[in-house]
């Protein structure tokens, strides 16, 4: 576990330096994030889904891939053309995701608080070493929201198409972000439902494959999904308590609350609900981040404390899951393994 915690402590040190400085410092962030990037990029069989990606990318030379998303597989094919090794492809995707996430943090005035205190400790390892398709798509979503969708709608649509072609489910991020942050977009909610229903009719084989992934993985008890629900409720509390600091309309609170309860209900039926909970957590964090507009341009100490606590809870949950799955499966997070070529150097 120390392999994961020590790089995070170094990153936290950089976060504290930036907070003392009064804002995000790109040089400090990028320097102090080198250990966590190296951990993800130089790994071997570590990360729950890593083995599955290795297996799928073994056949890239024959035109095969992982999933049905065209741009994700096109990028994998590009990396394969650079160096035909499934490990290089997997770790290349991890590096791309890591750099995009950290670049977004370093280029945002308030990135050090929302990205540094919540995103990195709570989700960095998950996005770069496990759910890699969604990880890359969520990094693209973070780039898309740097500029408000209503200011440059064409730009946002282009990013949305790219993100969706990297991971189909990430379309929900782009649609729901507009629905939750812009007044008068209630019809967007109906649009989301129509799009999802339409895709399910046009692409039944894709949804059938997604469903089969979770066969036999039904949630064992009421505690399944409880951590994500707690994080979502804490974020919702922050939205409401500090509502004058965030440009989020009440309809946004309502949508998040309804989705949080509904997705928790799904986790009691199937493990797939937990993956959708991750999408909602990501959405709510970006809502807080991009819609933060304090009148005096300063981060309130009490709000920063809330974010720190949310990040610690998310990190504690990640550590618990890693420990619980230690030694299980083909590529668990624990014990951490470096790439074979690095192991040979030792």
Task: Give each language-model segment a name.
Residues 141-154:
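Membrane-interface transmembrane helices that cradle and orient dolichyl/undecaprenyl
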Residues 27, 42-46, 51-55, 60, ...:
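Alpha-helical transmembrane segments and terminal signal-anchor/GPI-anchor hydrophobic tails
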Residues 113-131, 135-142:
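Membrane-embedded helix bundles of polyisoprenyl
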Residues 190-195, 296-315:
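Signature aromatic-anchored transmembrane alpha helix within multi-pass, membrane-resident enzymes
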Residues 2-13, 31, 35, 92-96, ...:
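Membrane-embedded alpha-helical segments of multi-pass membrane proteins
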Residues 157-158, 169-180:
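Transmembrane-embedded, aromatic-rich helix segments that form part
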Residues 70, 82-96:
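Loop-to-helix entry region of an early transmembrane alpha helix in multi-pass inner-membrane enzymes
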Residues 24, 102-122:
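Transmembrane-helix signature of polytopic, membrane-embedded enzymes
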């Amino acid at each position: 576990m120390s392999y994961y915690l020590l790089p995070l402590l170094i990153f936290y040190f950089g976060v504290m330096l930036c907070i003392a400085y009064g804002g995000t410092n790109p040089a400090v962030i990028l320097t102090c994030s080198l250990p966590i990037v190296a951990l993800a990029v130089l790994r071997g069989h570590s990360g729950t889904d890593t083995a599955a990606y290795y297996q799928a990318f073994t056949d890239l030379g024959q035109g095969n891939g992982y999933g049905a998303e065209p741009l994700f597989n096109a990028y994998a094919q590009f990396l394969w053309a650079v160096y035909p090794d499934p490990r290089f492809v997997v770790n290349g995707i991890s590096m791309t995701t890591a750099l995009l996430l950290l670049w977004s943090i370093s280029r945002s005035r308030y990135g050090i608080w929302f990205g540094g205190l919540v995103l990195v400790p709570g989700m960095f390892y998950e996005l770069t070493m496990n759910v890699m398709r969604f990880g890359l798509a969520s990094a693209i979503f973070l780039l898309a929201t740097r500029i408000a969708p209503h200011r440059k709608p064409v730009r946002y649509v282009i990013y949305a198409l790219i993100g969706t072609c990297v991971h189909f489910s990430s379309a929900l991020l782009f649609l729901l972000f507009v629905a939750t942050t812009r007044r008068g977009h209630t019809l967007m909610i109906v649009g989301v439902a129509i799009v999802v229903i339409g895709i399910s009719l046009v692409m039944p084989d894709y949804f059938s494959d997604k469903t089969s992934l979770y066969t036999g993985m039904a949630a064992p008890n009421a505690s399944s999904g409880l951590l994500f629900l707690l994080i979502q409720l804490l974020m919702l509390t922050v939205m409401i308590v500090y509502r004058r600091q965030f440009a989020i309309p009440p309809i946004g609170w309502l949508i998040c609350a309804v989705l949080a309860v509904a997705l928790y209900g799904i986790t009691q039926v199937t493990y797939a609900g937990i993956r959708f909970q991750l999408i909602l957590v990501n959405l709510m964090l970006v809502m807080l981040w991009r819609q933060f507009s304090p009148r005096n341009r300063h981060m309130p100490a009490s709000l920063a404390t809330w974010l720190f606590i949310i990040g610690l809870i998310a990190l504690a949950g990640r550590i618990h899951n890693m420990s619980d799955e230690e030694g299980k499966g083909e590529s668990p997070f624990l014990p951490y393994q470096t790439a074979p070529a690095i192991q040979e150097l030792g």
